[in-house]
Design a protein with these regions (language model features):
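A glycine-centered beta->alpha junction motif in the catalytic cores
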Residues: 116-129, 181-188, 310-326
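ATP-binding glycine-rich phosphate-binding loop
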Residues: 37-59
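Regulatory N- and C-terminal appendages and interdomain linkers associated
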Residues: 4, 26-45, 205-208, 334-344
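ATP-binding pocket architecture of kinase catalytic cores
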Residues: 63-157
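ATP-dependent phospho-/nucleotidyl transfer catalytic cores
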Residues: 48, 68-75, 157-231, 285
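Active-site activation/catalytic loop segments of kinase-like enzymes and analogous catalytic loops
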Residues: 262-295, 308-326
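Active-site acidic catalytic loop and adjacent metal/ATP-binding pocket
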Residues: 57, 98, 214-263
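ATP/Mg2+ or Mg2+-diphosphate-binding catalytic cores
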Residues: 315-344
Length: 344
């Protein structure tokens, strides 16, 4: 409110350097946007610049690029870039590869010390989870990505905190402790809200299911944890799968880690099946489509079983309640809790 954006872009064709740029006017004071000084560090001819969600979308002579502030480590960037290099040598995937600046660096700094990255981007729409064909196209690409990631040998230098994550059994154990803590808080309240009464009414059923899933997954990880660990995307959902005319792009690898690839498949399948009222036909089609590219072993299917068994949506609702304003819970959250009980 009270902010007006003015876009003025000029070029030096000989050097492909952005000269002047976007102005942000606040209270009559003009502040030059940082993206101009950052883009001038790249061998790119800028044709157009527009704001995206938390980033700048840049039309260039080398295609669409995305400019975003970066707050991670250089080691993390190097890890992702090395993986992209190996993927491209074997597969030529549609991914959001980082662009190096004139100095050959992945990171560029603005005068105020902020650090920025530029990467390849796609103007195509996100995967529509309500469209079976798009869902199965996405599954094909997920399987292809997983197959190629399995060929990449994990390097000792990649042993970073963001790459070595909790196994799902340990994560379930932590979530169960959070469920117990929230239930104890609710039971000790004298006057309970409708949401809290709903939790008291169905907690035992969901918690027993959570315990069974945790026990099964812990045993699974104890026997198969090491042998089932490969590089995973880490955040696969419809927002990170873009439907290009000739292929399917997978973007935002900032949570890529060493773990169980079935977690990637589970998260995407769950999102899709929720949109289709848990259609068994669609679920089987997704598994068959994945298996045509990367056959699912009995071990993979066991892992998927325990992931689906865990009442993740229930935990999310309870955890949201416990960490938010407990005095007021939106009616929609109460409906979600009741819907979860009906789906059992």
């Amino acid at each position: 409110r009270g902010q007006t954006f003015f876009f003025h872009v000029y070029f030096r064709p000989a050097t492909h350097t952005l000269e002047v740029a976007d102005e942000l006017r606040v209270g009559g004071v003009v502040v030059i946007e940082k993206y101009t000084e950052v883009l001038s560090q790249y061998e790119l001819e800028i044709l157009d610049v527009r704001r995206g969600r938390g980033a700048w979308l840049c039309e260039t002579n080398q295609g669409l690029k995305l400019l975003r502030e970066y707050k991670g480590t250089i080691k993390r960037l190097d890890f992702e870039d090395q993986v992209f290099t190996q993927l491209e040598e074997a597969w030529h995937p549609f991914v959001d590869r980082y662009v190096r600046n004139r100095e050959g660096e992945l990171l560029s700094s603005a005068d105020d010390g902020t650090r920025w990255i530029v990467k390849d981007w796609y103007a195509d729409k996100e995967c529509n989870l309500k469209d079976d064909k798009e869902v199965l196209r996405a599954i094909t690409q997920i399987a292809s990505l997983h197959k190629m990631l399995r060929e990449i040998e994990f390097k000792e230098e990649w042993n970073l905190g963001s790459i070595l994550v909790q196994l799902p059994g340990d994560e379930m154990e932590r979530h169960n402790r959070e469920l117990i803590r929230a239930r104890s808080f609710i039971r000790n309240k004298r006057k309970k809200t409708e949401f809290e009464l709903c939790v008291i009414g169905n907690y035992d059923m969901f918690y027993e299911q959570a315990k069974d899933a945790r026990l099964g997954m812990k045993e699974f990880c104890a026997y198969h944890g090491d042998e089932e660990c490969y590089l995973c995307h880490g955040d696969l959902n419809q927002h990170h799968i873009l439907m290009c005319p000739r292929d399917v792009a997978v973007v935002e690898f900032n949570r890529m880690h060493l773990g169980m690839q079935m977690e990637d498949l589970y998260h995407f399948m769950r999102k899709a099946m929720e949109k289709h009222d848990w259609s068994l036909k669609l679920g089987n089609s997704m598994l068959e489509t994945y298996s045509r590219i990367l056959p699912l072993s009995d071990t993979d299917r066991t892992c998927l079983y325990y992931l689906f068994l865990y009442p993740e949506k229930y935990w999310k609702q309870i955890n949201f309640y416990y960490n938010a304003n407990k005095a007021w819970i939106p009616a929609r959250n109460i409906e979600k809790l009741k819907d979860l009980e009906l789906q059992q």
